[in-house]
């Protein structure tokens, strides 16, 4: 814990640029790296994977009967940030319930935890623009390419 800095300021000031990886046109931060950085600064930080009860016992995903999503949270210094994320395939499209595997759910949990960590500040900029409609994303990518050429 750094004096006079909020959790957000402390984590947001960590340069993660050399740890950012890309896959299928999207940038991401490894969950292991993100969690390691959080624990270095805040050893008492905790995460939670939400579960729901079934007749067979608790399971770690939620469903509407068609697709599935996971819910996780990260708590640092008493502040909990919750993140929900669809269970997706390698193209980042929702997986239908009949095709869902435990591997898919586990990957979604780790990605969700990384996004919950980002809400606390670490690598938050990585997710800027991910909520833009596809047309706006394409325009933004064109502008970024043009700026890189200049």
Task: Label each PLM-derived region with a short phrase.
Residues 1-150:
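Polyanion-binding surfaces on beta-sheet-dominated domains and ring/shell assemblies
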